[in-house]
């Protein structure tokens, strides 16, 4: 089915997804919608109040006053023009257009639009891989309300990057499918917006895109020539998108070179990068696969690093059932073994964090794993209801139960 094919509104999965997403947002964010609280935090998420919200107020004031963008409040003065491109992103543009007295509501509306983007555009992406059905809707919802999005999404910029990442993946899949060329322009512009939003998220997403193109080409049994052609085209569009955002390149480069990350790239030790995590770090990985809260919240958090920086892998317990099902099913066993082994390797090796985040003491890249988990859940639900061999379903369920029990025993022995 194409994206433009019309269906009766009560049968349109996008309409139902819109309603479900809106309902879940209302439920999860009712404290801010109905309880008289602003969507800012004063605990370990205090950056939202001390940095983000303050910046939004300042840029909203500058926009409304018509000032040049040179702030005298910062030391001897500071040119803020290099920050302006970030407010061309629709989610951020809303924040400076809203009157300052309505800024708390604008922040909440922006969060809603980001989650809605992840849900609806995520659905369009997953539909290209598995068609319509309950699995596609489940995958979109699993991604939108995954542990990473809900936790790190409290940091407004992270949620913006997750929404743009979802849009990027949709246009990337359109490109790989050879669809209309205007969609390539969407891919280019999304790269530009990602550059404005966060240079290191763009960097991480570029790595994921390369992996995705390679693995997708292998799964689709495409020729090396075809895969290489797609990779070159993707690289060209990435460069074009970066050049379009050229106004932000110089300040971004300056910010990076002056940051701690630049020193980490060249000065960090490489010892132990290919030795799997052990002890507390490994226990945290297992625990946070089930829930962000399993090791406590904020100051009560007992895992590795801190509540935010500790790895976040929680999507749904259905991930275990999906993996087990595809491992048991003969037609998918080899692919499942390969992909599961690859994901586990990336998660347990410090090398991954060092390459993607420039330090082994951060796991901000794990949104990629959550995105793949949501895909696995969708494929599982899409396939399991069509599976005629009930023995496969039962064996998959039994294996999942064993794996789940073993992981829980390990987690509680660690705690």
Language model regions located:
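Membrane-interface starts of transmembrane alpha-helices
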Residues: 12-16, 99-106, 110, 131-139, ...
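Contiguous transmembrane helix-bundle modules in multi-pass membrane proteins
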Residues: 182-183, 201, 334-415
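Membrane-interface coil-to-helix junctions
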Residues: 22-118, 141-163, 256-263, 269-311, ...
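Start-transfer (signal-anchor) and selected internal transmembrane alpha helices
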Residues: 1-32, 229-233
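Alpha-helical transmembrane segments
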Residues: 13-28, 189, 237-241, 282, ...
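Membrane-embedded alpha-helical segments of multi-pass membrane proteins
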Residues: 109-117, 159-167, 206, 311-318, ...
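Membrane-embedded helix bundles of polyisoprenyl
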Residues: 21, 112, 116-128, 134-219, ...
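Membrane-interface helix-loop-helix junctions at transmembrane boundaries of multi-pass membrane enzymes
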Residues: 222-232, 321-344
């Amino acid at each position: 089915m194409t994206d433009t094919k019309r269906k009766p509104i009560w049968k349109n999965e996008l309409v139902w997804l819109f309603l479900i997403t809106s309902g879940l947002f209302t439920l999860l964010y009712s404290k801010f919608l109905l309880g008289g609280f602003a969507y800012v935090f004063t605990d370990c998420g205090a950056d939202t109040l001390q940095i983000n919200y303050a910046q939004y107020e300042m840029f909203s004031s500058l926009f409304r006053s018509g000032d040049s963008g040179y702030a005298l409040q910062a030391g001897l003065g500071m040119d803020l023009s290099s920050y302006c491109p970030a407010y061309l992103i629709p989610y951020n543009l809303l924040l400076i257009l809203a009157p300052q007295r309505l800024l708390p509501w604008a922040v909440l509306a922006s969060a809603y639009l980001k989650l809605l983007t992840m849900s609806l555009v995520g659905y369009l992406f997953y539909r290209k891989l598995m068609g319509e059905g309950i699995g596609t809707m489940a995958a979109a919802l699993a991604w939108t309300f995954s542990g990473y999005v809900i936790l790190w999404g409290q940091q407004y910029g992270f949620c913006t990057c997750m929404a743009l990442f979802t849009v990027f993946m949709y246009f990337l899949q359109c490109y790989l499918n050879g669809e209309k060329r205007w969609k390539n322009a969407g891919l280019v512009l999304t790269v530009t917006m990602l550059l404005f939003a966060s240079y290191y998220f763009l960097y991480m997403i570029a790595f994921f895109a390369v992996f995705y193109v390679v693995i997708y080409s292998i799964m689709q049994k495409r020729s090396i020539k075809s895969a290489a052609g797609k990779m070159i085209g993707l690289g060209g569009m990435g460069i074009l998108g970066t050049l379009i955002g050229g106004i932000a390149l110089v300040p971004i480069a300056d910010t990076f070179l002056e940051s701690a990350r630049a020193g980490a790239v060249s000065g960090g030790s490489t010892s132990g990068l290919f030795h799997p995590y052990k002890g507390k770090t490994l226990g945290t990985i297992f625990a946070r696969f089930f829930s962000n809260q399993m090791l406590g919240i904020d100051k009560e958090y007992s895992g590795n690093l801190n509540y935010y920086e500790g790895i976040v892998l929680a999507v749904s317990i259905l991930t275990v059932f999906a993996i087990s099902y595809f491992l048991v099913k003969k037609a998918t066993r080899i692919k499942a073994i390969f992909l599961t082994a690859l994901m586990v390797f990336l998660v347990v090796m410090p090398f991954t964090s060092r390459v993607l985040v420039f330090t082994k003491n951060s796991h901000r890249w794990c949104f990629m794993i959550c995105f793949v988990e949501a895909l696995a859940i969708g494929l599982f639900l899409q396939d399991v209801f069509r599976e005629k061999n009930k023995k496969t379903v039962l064996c998959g369920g039994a294996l999942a139960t064993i794996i789940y029990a073993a992981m829980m025993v390990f987690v509680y022995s660690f705690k």
